Amino acid sequence: MMRGVLVIMRLLCLGMLFTGCAGVPNSSAPQAIGTVERPVPSNLPKPTPGMDPDVLLREFFKATADPANRHLAARQFLTQSASNAWDDAGRALLIDHVVFVETRGAERVSATMRADILGSLSDMGVFETAEGVLPDPGPVELIKTSGGWRIDRLPNGVFLDWQQFQATYKRNTLYFADPTGKTVVPDPRYVAVLGHDQLATELVSKLLAGPRPEMAHAVRNLLAPPLRLRGPVTRADGSKSGIGRGYGGARIDLEKLSTTDPHSRQLLAAQIIWTLARADIRGPYVINADGAPLDDRFADGWTTSDVAATDPGVADGAGAGLHALVGGALVSLIGQNTTTVLGAFGRMGYQTGAALSRSGRQVASVVTLRRGAPDMAASLWIGDLGGEAVQSADGHSLSRPSWSLDDAVWVVVDTNNVLRAIPEPASGQPARIPVDSAAVASRFPGPITDLQLSRDGTRAAMVIGGQVILAGVEQTQAGQFALTYPRRLGFGLGSSVVSLSWRTGDDIVVTRTDATHPVSYVNLDGVNSDAPARGLQVPLSVIAANPSTVYVAGPQGVLQYSASVAESQQGWSEVAGLTVMGAEPVLPG
């Protein structure tokens, strides 16, 4: 017997990211990832008679990245009995720095596994980052067979090789309707399919299966059961190849449609169209239900223009332009000149945080008196841009406000109490309604120093203890709101986050105390990456963003970064007119 340490491989760092042939056991639960039946891809490893046990283990973990036919590629490395016993269903773990400690004999090898956890992949294709050391899953045992070494015992579940995972899976985004019916909400998924022509069917099937569990009560799914696909998605003319390529379009035939409401049918189409369009499956999109067009106006096919009102990439209130707080008052930027806005928000001093409404026509602003003193007092004011304002909340401290799609303003009072302020229909006076944040407080105790709602209003991103915490926004049957399913994003950011803003519905940008990387991005999966730092001075404070531009408050005033400029010119530049110490950017949201 001999003992040895085998380092399987060092997988890629998460960085810029943006599970003889053994049979499949009948008792194993089905794997929802990659439900398309297809042959094992030729680029995946296969066991060979002369393969050494350490090599076979390494190749097995590569093969687990392909879930097709219930991990058939990986099962080729197992004995029949091991394949019968292996339950590959459920959440898979993505691991890094994998080390096997072997105990080797002539006919049998036993290995224990050590690894770092990078994240997990659910059976719905939901990827979430994580960190920590993999708990001991139990030994992996190999035996020598007539066909070479095979795995005869292994832990249940799937451990994914990150590098092979990247080669096998592609990130796609499903879209569900927000509760107000005004837009669609992203739900990123990782899908493993062989060809482009299978992808459309896979994505529509996932829409029919519904949102991830934590979104189930935060969004609407117009494709919920009993609605189902009548057959695979085809080209608009019914052919099975070239789907969504050129002008061939895509045809989706549904059955058991129950809704007759035109707006609901429009939202149903929007879910399908944005899901396929964002996956580069081009229209026109012929959508039929029970043998007839979903909408007679679009019998020949829908385009993205037909559902433009729900476009998830549109910047809220783009026409309002950039505003800022300068010297405690709200100013607007016109060209390279600033003008103090008319009305209450131009007159009031000591404003410390503000946001324009999603339409850009209203303002919510926090006034803080005796900032930093023991008797500090803060108040929230809401009103029309250029008009008068109404006091809507008060406390010792208030966070920067954030607007929801229903024109409610969310703030954190005294660091822990989340509040919605919304005008009462009868009087027009603001109602102050507490938000249930118990789930957040129990898992992530500590002061909430920033809270910003996603543009669709279904998620809240918070800064707690310098970390980015994401929670769902759910409305209860009683009409109250709650923050649910909180989880941490961006483990690589540590506890350095100061302020955050939603750049898109899937992408958050943050300022940090890290002088080397003072601005970073993090997406809904939890993957973080660093923005360029050229031109920035630290410390940075408030950040505000839209899909095209990121603005930060720094020692020299407000700076901006736009990825749309030439790469040679990319970097942070001063915003003319806002090069004033203490100036803070203000955008809709």
UniProtKB/Swiss-Prot annotation:
Q: Report the source organism.
A: Mycobacterium leprae (strain TN)
Lipid sites, type N-palmitoyl cysteine: C21
Q: What is the lineage of its organism?
A: Bacteria, Bacillati, Actinomycetota, Actinomycetes, Mycobacteriales
Location within or outside the cell: Cell membrane
Q: Extract the PROSITE patterns matched here.
A: PROKAR_LIPOPROTEIN
The domain of life is Bacteria
* Lipid bilayer topology: Lipid-anchor
For whether the record's keyword set contains Nucleotidyltransferase, the answer is no
Could you tell me what this protein is called? Answer: Lipoprotein LpqB
Which one Pfam family would you cite for this protein? Gmad1
| Residues covalently joined to lipid (S-diacylglycerol cysteine) | C21
Gene name for this UniProt entry: lpqB
In the UniProt record, the signal sequence range is: 1-20
